[in-house]
Regions:
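A short, basic N-terminal segment
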Residues: 1-22
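Helix-loop-helix "sensor" segment of P-loop NTPases
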Residues: 96-100, 150-211, 215-217
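Conserved alpha-helical scaffold flanking the Walker A/P-loop in AAA+ ATPase domains
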Residues: 15-18, 84-100
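Conserved NTP-binding/hydrolysis module of P-loop NTPases
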Residues: 51-54, 62-81
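Conserved nucleotide-binding/hydrolysis micro-motifs of P-loop NTPases
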Residues: 33-34, 60-64, 113-115, 144-149, ...
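Walker A/P-loop nucleotide-binding motif
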Residues: 22-42
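Walker A/P-loop
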Residues: 37-53
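Conserved Walker B catalytic segment
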Residues: 25, 95, 101-141, 153-154
């Protein structure tokens, strides 16, 4: 089905395109159910697999050693149980891929608000944030607004200073609610005038910025 391109969707898509092209670090935040993950997946799925290595992490309660294992496996490196060996292997491989310009590596972390501080600190060490001005891959963090509290920690200042793109979702306006509902109805071959004009204001008031809640309200209205 065709995705509805809201202002938030377009803003996040454009910013994702920019940081992927510039090998930057992006943070995208919103309340639950506003479409961040959908937008992230749509962008990642559109990338050429012969050009990009995409590492998608959603199990964000992982430990530091789990994090290294995931990166190690995704990069096709030698298996080892030693954290120090994995660290060196991953760092060298990222540098090699960058210097030879063979592949672009993207690490995308979803539900970032649950990410352990120890894992974020590993990002700092792995990427040489304290000493090196060069970025070896694109880092994308998508999560709820609470992630900001973690980013404000003093120990994460080197990481925070390197973030070059951030966006917080604003949610649908009333006109977008109508356009979204009409597009949903059309996608299932329903008449686009099933809802009266005043219904859109009610839906807008009840959805509380959540597209997920809006979908539930639409479905219940049609039963």
């Amino acid at each position: 089905s065709t995705l509805y391109a809201s202002n938030d969707f377009n803003q996040m898509t454009n910013r994702l395109d920019f940081i992927i092209r510039s090998r930057g670090i992006g943070v995208f935040l919103s309340s639950p159910g506003m479409g961040k993950t959908t937008c992230l997946r749509k962008t990642l799925e559109s990338l050429n697999p012969n050009r990009y290595v995409v590492i998608y992490i959603c199990m964000t309660t992982i430990t530091a050693i789990d994090f290294y294992r995931m990166l190690n496996d995704a990069l096709g490196l030698e298996e080892t149980t030693k954290k120090s060996q994995m660290f060196n292997q991953i760092q060298e491989e990222l540098k090699r891929l960058t210097s030879e310009n063979k592949m672009e590596v993207i690490i995308a972390v979803d539900e970032a608000q649950f990410l352990r501080k120890e894992v974020l600190r590993e990002f700092i060490m792995l990427m040489n944030f304290d000493y090196d001005s060069k970025d070896y891959c694109t880092l994308i963090f998508v999560g709820q607004n609470e992630f900001l509290r973690t980013l404000r920690l003093k120990s994460l200042e080197p990481f925070r200073q390197r973030i070059n793109m951030n966006y917080t979702f604003t949610g649908f306006n009333e006109e977008e609610v109508k356009n979204y509902v009409v597009s949903r109805l059309k996608s299932v071959n329903c008449r686009s005038d099933l809802f009266k004009e005043e219904c859109y204001h009610t839906l807008y008031s009840l959805m509380n910025t959540s597209v997920r809640i809006l979908n539930l309200l639409i479905n219940k209205s049609l039963i």
